């Protein structure tokens, strides 16, 4: 069922709006008098109403989460529609929303597919033309769409509350899921180019960067350098030694990359270490093992998801009892651990079990992108059964890929990232990293790893840090809860001014259900981390936030807490 309540302007309300608009009661009173006797025309009054709404605090509540125009650029247009930025739709409406060719918006949720064209009052709803009042527009480099129109066609209720200056929308669909039973990113131009890793053990890097490229599509088309990621990541490994997803996360989180393929081409075993990242990755979510619904939602909303499988094939030309070349279908059931990374780019719940070379209980498969060139499978793509032992066990989706000018400075001491975990045999812990401001700056955000799902966090800043006793003067700057494990950058509620040379601490309290060691740390764990640098950080830990100890006295390690600032 759908509900919609439009903004109705009565004469008395309009008169009040005009009296607010026109401050003087003398000369301009005659203007009001003339309007009272005139026919109330929408083109005259609606812009005044919209202006009055936009000048105040405008609140938009979507599925019980509140947004305001203090932080997000919502506005009411001259048709009295609340226009919302397309950039928030994916998370706010829990849907797929992408801009094609700068002039077309495709929104998908449940079984609905909406296509908006720039400045066109006709949209397509599941292939059928429908007329809307407020078309898709572009303003200040951002696309905007009517929340009322989205609500009408995505099974949302919509209410405008004039007294509170608040729009409210809520999903009232009877569907239990936001995703269809079949979905393929190839049909939506959201799959990156098929590439070939050759004889090197670089599948983990191809999977990570291909997944990132998919997330950026169709709005941005990039090809990132695998050579740079595999040869400049801080780990003591060659391209023949292989790797895994946390290595890629560390490389990206530290702003070492990504860099462009054309600037550091693949396959020559050479690299250019002084290249700078063309994107800054600020968020990478780790989806729980075998949570197929969440994996599908991530593909649907964001793009390709990096995952790991056990691959019994040695090359695109080899054979295996687990792979059917006729149907490009693979399923391994056994005890072997993952040895190969691929990208999930879709799924088909009805994909027949008869397409596989092994006997299976039921239908269904993920559609996956490999890094063995277009000669493998169906142009580089193959199907992996839902019943495969390892598919969907380790999953990463790159949800926060930002422009490289998002912050002026990064402060960090954990270039190898999340190598291990530290704790006091309980769910919560305090950790703090101390840094020195390089110039006059505003501290605006911090990042850390959530080592398990449903982690709750609180972030604090300590100015003018001298020693452990300074940690009693913490200023709260952010708090929240994270649904998935992963790497997160949290903007502060307020900026903290730092002077050049000032020592400061960023403090993290984190609580992770069922954890005993919830704090991510960097340390020398094995041959791969033999080159880790541990004398570049100053960190402290506490069980209660009152008694602190230098982390070097607990474990020879660095704490994974970074800080971000802008010049002032």
Tell me what each language-model feature is.
Residues 3-27:
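Sec-dependent N-terminal signal peptides of Gram-positive bacterial secreted proteins and lipoproteins
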Residues 19-181:
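Primary recognition of N-terminal secretory signal peptides and signal-anchoring hydrophobic helices
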Residues 89, 150, 476-479, 558, ...:
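Extracellular/oxidizing-compartment recognition motifs
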Residues 141, 303, 486, 500-502:
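Surface-exposed loop/turn positions
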Residues 170-444, 449-480, 517-524:
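Catalytic-core signature of thiol
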Residues 446, 488-529:
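Short, well-structured beta-strand segments enriched in hydrophobic/aromatic residues
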Residues 479-486, 498:
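Short proline/glycine- and polar residue-rich coil/turn motifs
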Residues 509-568:
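Short, surface-exposed beta-strand/loop patches at domain edges
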